[in-house]
Amino acid sequence: MTATPPPAVTAHRRIQGLDLLRGAAILLVLLRHSWPDLFGGAGIVGVVVFFTLSGYLITGLLADDVRRFGRIRYGRFYRNRFFRLIPALLFVLVGLVVMEGLLDVSDTRRFVPRTIGVALTYTMNIPLFNHGSPNFSHLWTLANEEQFYLVWPLIVFIGVRYRKLRVLVAVTAVVLVVLLVASVAWHRDDIGTIYNHPTTWTISMVVGAAAKLAEPRLDALIGGRRAAPAAAVGAVALTAMALVPDAKDHLVTYLVGGSAVGVSTVLVLWKLKEWTVAPRGVGLLVKLGVISYAVYLWNYPISWWLRDGGAPEVPVTTVVLSIAAGVVSWVVVERPVARLKARLETRASDGPKRPESVSAARS
């Protein structure tokens, strides 16, 4: 999920249009988990929207480091990722210990230690070994993002150092496509096997990163008065893909789905990034976007805990409980940690700023 500073701490840097996009993405995930027959592709679309936005934002943070300091501040980068991602993850793992360790509602008590280990090492997307409780298999998306956070700063650093960042981005995209095609070919008889593999959807993060690096060109191409029509096209495409029945079972989903959702997300993003304050009427979706990370963490296990616990199958109950858990996570864990991080940052000196052009990062 995308790591963004909480609004209560850094409201001057938060763009409500991006929270609106996050809210729409997590809503798609909620719809897919509760009404899979109607929203067959919504989970894929929602997750890949997050991936694309993550690639866009993280590349922006790294490029900003180059512009201001002439280098990537790795310590600060990974510290911020830790403060943003780990507390909410630990909170949902407490839920795992209670529901599956103490109460054993899913008959998975024996898997709890392994699940915690896999979750904290971000290896849920690595195939060919036991990941623990199936109720936490959705953490493959976090694994994808964390692995991206490990590799991408190094690519940006090398690209900036040798003024070949665009070339490296293109090479990375080609390598990912080759790996994806090979994976599809190898698993074509059981294509759903590759759904949560590391290379299946990572191309969308590179699409987001490329969009950030090409921002001036895209501003000229789909900015200004063209932004709204372009966003409408992107939104229609995302909606259509979200309604594809049994999307996980189609070979074409894996071959072009990541790129198609990534490009469509960029079209929508180019309009929404202008909305520092979102229009009236979408406030609830913006608020949902703020807590989207925690809602995602809790939604999938809650859906299974209800079923395994014998609760009546009322899909809307899962949605309501997931949002409630997200609110609790935000109020009890994420917001206090964000405030602590903000206090620590005010005490620390960033060092002398270096007015260096970011053009090197875009070469």
What positions do the PLM features span?
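Alpha-helical transmembrane segments in multi-pass integral membrane proteins
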Residues: 2-17, 24-46, 58-76, 98-102, ...
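Hydrophobic residues within the alpha-helical transmembrane core of Major Facilitator Superfamily
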Residues: 30, 94, 120, 151, ...
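Structured binding elements
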Residues: 50
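Alpha-helical transmembrane segments of multi-pass membrane proteins
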Residues: 75, 79-92, 156
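Hydrophobic alpha-helical membrane-insertion segments
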Residues: 84-106, 110
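Extracytosolic (periplasmic/ER-lumenal) interhelical loops and adjacent juxtamembrane/interface segments
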Residues: 112-132
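Function-critical hydrophobic alpha-helical transmembrane segments in multi-pass membrane proteins
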Residues: 132-157
